């Protein structure tokens, strides 16, 4: 009798039919789509054979939009309606966008994510990104000849929850099923690791148009373990262009510039930067709207000089990522360069000097992320051949915690924890009869809630009334493979439950992430003192309240002198708790606890006698 083969649920394609899935690199400057054909990943070109799609969208008064090269060509004459580098705005509020006052766009002052005023109406970064994704989806379906079942879309490793959610929302608008959000450095490691059968510790240095990521990975026998991540999602090739634009303006004395002239000179600056990747000098020519002619010669040494601090700025997260991973530059077997901006000779030299080795450049830095994403998409779609499996172990960049009494933070998921991850911890009530609990979800490394970033708040209601400390509330944090967080709280006795999917209105800037981490190191001792003070104050308040309730019900068990002594101890605790010395508060609490031991014993005796009153020996036990 023939044996029937049974595949995992959702992993079995129809006989002789492949499930079409693609990898998409949604970049700041350019975007790409790739797929696996005949077991080989390849970038899918447009009808003109071009692999890259400029991440540019121009909106027209009739509501239509031009995407890609056509929009890029129109950017100079219509700068306000031509949206470039929209990835920098994803999941960001107005206050999070760097140099917003110098932007060419008309921003709308609205709550939540930043909005852009265009000829076709007000557009969000999610809508702009959806136009780019829809174009890539159509390109893939035309090239592959059928509809897609889904896509793996790459994001910077340092994208926070809001930025990741915005990316998923854009994909949904574009009609794409997201199989996975994959960190860009991890995608590059897949492409390199599987191509070269590499093992060991690798660093992925990813400098794109608008973002910078550094990841330290350990590759062993098909397992990709991310040991640490770092970066800055507001630093990229665009910043080198901006620095060069400022140099041009200073050389010619052109202030102020019209929007059209700014965009024209930015285009010339980018072209000059790219030219200097393969030559020692270049000429910048432009005719402004006033008729003024710009003619400058720029040599490589000058460009290196005016952008040197940007190059050095990338090395700060590199040092920290290595420190977090517990390794040094000498332990790194290879350095993978990702992103078009890594073509700059100054970048390659700085990376090579720091790690003491030539970085790996045998794969096109513009394409490597899309190729790795395509391989992961092919795996998730169930098209892989036996032996092509691999395991990704990614991490979260910042700790996740919950606020407890006294404004303290209890960390539930530490930073650099491997995802997906689920962690749970039990908490209890503070007061007798408490029937609700407020859950405050936080992100950061500090000890006090006021120093961390608030992600969400929700309430667990319906807790059965009990004495303080009797209820057991289990709080569970779940971070999925896309890095998105959900939190649930459950009272274990009654089963009452509440949950929230964390969707902040806008994201956490990576300057904030870096600042939060730096502050956590600098303020560690101060934070621990504050935490100890808050903990002792909470314990003091709890003991005073419990003693007060006990005196109300059983105060007649004490003589007048004993009652006066307890009252004095309580007053002493309350007074000392107003101070800043946590050791003094702890000592006062211990004195009150010891001073009420005899009272507690008498209460216990009374309780036992009351419980046994009127019962026969046979009825007990």
Swiss-Prot record:
The keyword Kinase does not apply. The keyword Transmembrane helix does not apply. Gene3D superfamilies: 1.20.1270.10, 3.30.420.40, Actin, Chain A, domain 4 (3.90.640.10), Substrate Binding Domain Of DNAk, Chain A, domain 1 (2.60.34.10). PROSITE patterns: HSP70_1, HSP70_2, HSP70_3. NCBIfam families: HscA, PRK05183.1. Belongs to the heat shock protein 70 family. Chaperone involved in the maturation of iron-sulfur cluster-containing proteins. Has a low intrinsic ATPase activity which is markedly stimulated by HscB. This is Chaperone protein HscA homolog.
């Amino acid at each position: 009798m023939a044996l029937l083969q049974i595949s995992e649920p959702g992993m079995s394609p129809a006989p002789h039919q492949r499930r079409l899935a693609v990898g998409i690199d949604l970049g700041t400057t350019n975007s790409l789509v790739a797929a696996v054909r005949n077991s080989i990943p390849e970038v899918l070109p447009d009808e003109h054979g071009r692999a890259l799609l400029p991440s540019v969208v121009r909106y027209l008064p009739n509501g239509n939009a031009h995407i890609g090269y056509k929009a890029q060509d129109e950017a100079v004459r219509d700068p306000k309606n031509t949206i470039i580098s929209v990835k920098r705005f994803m999941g960001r509020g107005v206050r999070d966008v760097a140099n917003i006052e110098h932007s060419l766009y008309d921003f709308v002052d609205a709550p939540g994510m930043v909005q852009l005023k265009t000829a076709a109406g007000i557009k969000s970064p999610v809508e702009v990104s959806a136009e780019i994704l829809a174009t890539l989806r159509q390109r893939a379906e035309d090239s592959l000849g059928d509809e897609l079942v889904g896509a793996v879309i790459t994001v910077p490793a340092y994208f926070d929850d809001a930025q990741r959610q915005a990316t998923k929302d854009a994909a949904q608008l574009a009609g794409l099923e997201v199989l996975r959000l994959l960190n860009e450095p991890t995608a590059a490691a897949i492409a390199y690791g599987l191509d070269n059968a590499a093992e060991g510790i690798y660093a992925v240095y990813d400098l794109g148009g608008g973002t910078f990521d550094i990841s330290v990975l350990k590759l062993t026998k098909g397992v990709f373990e991310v040991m640490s991540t770092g970066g800055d999602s507001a630093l990229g090739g665009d910043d080198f262009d901006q620095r060069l634009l400022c140099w041009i303006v200073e050389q010619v004395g052109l202030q102020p510039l019209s929007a059209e002239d700014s965009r024209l000179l930015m285009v010339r600056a980018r072209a000059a930067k790219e030219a200097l990747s393969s030559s020692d000098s270049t000429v910048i020519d432009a005719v402004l709207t006033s008729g003024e002619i710009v003619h400058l010669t720029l040599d490589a040494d000058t460009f290196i000089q005016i952008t040197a601090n940007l190059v050095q700025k990338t090395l700060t997260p590199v040092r920290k990522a290595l420190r977090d991973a517990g390794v040094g530059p000498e332990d790194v077997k290879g350095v993978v360069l990702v992103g078009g901006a890594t073509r700059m000779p100054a970048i390659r030299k700085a990376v090579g000097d720091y790690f003491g080795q030539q970085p790996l450049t045998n794969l096109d830095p513009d394409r490597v992320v899309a190729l790795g994403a395509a391989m992961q998409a092919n795996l998730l779609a169930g098209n892989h051949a036996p032996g092509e499996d691999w395991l990704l172990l990614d991490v979260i960049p910042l700790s996740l915690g919950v606020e407890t009494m006294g404004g303290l933070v209890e960390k539930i998921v530490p930073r650099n924890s491997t995802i997906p991850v689920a962690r749970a911890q039990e908490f209890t009530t503070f007061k007798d009869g408490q029937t609700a609990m407020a859950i405050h979800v936080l992100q950061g490394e500090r000890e006090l809630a006021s120093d961390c970033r608030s992600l969400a708040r929700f309430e667990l209601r319906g807790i059965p009334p009990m004495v303080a400390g009797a209820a057991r509330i289990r709080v569970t944090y779940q971070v999925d493979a896309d890095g998105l967080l959900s939190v649930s709280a459950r009272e274990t006795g009654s089963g009452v439950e509440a949950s929230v999917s964390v969707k902040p209105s806008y994201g956490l800037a990576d300057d904030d992430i870096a600042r939060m981490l730096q502050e956590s190191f600098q303020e560690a001792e101060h934070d621990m003192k504050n935490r100890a003070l808050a903990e002792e104050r909470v314990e003091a308040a709890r003991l005073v309240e419990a003693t007060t309730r006990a005196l109300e019900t059983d105060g007649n068990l004490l003589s007048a002198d004993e009652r006066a002594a307890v009252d004095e101890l309580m007053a002493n605790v309350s007074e000392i708790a107003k101070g800043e010395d946590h050791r003094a508060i702890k000592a006062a609490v211990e004195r009150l606890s010891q001073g009420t031991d005899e009272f507690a014993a008498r209460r216990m005796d009374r309780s036992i006698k009351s419980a046994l009153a009127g019962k026969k020996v046979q009825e007990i036990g």
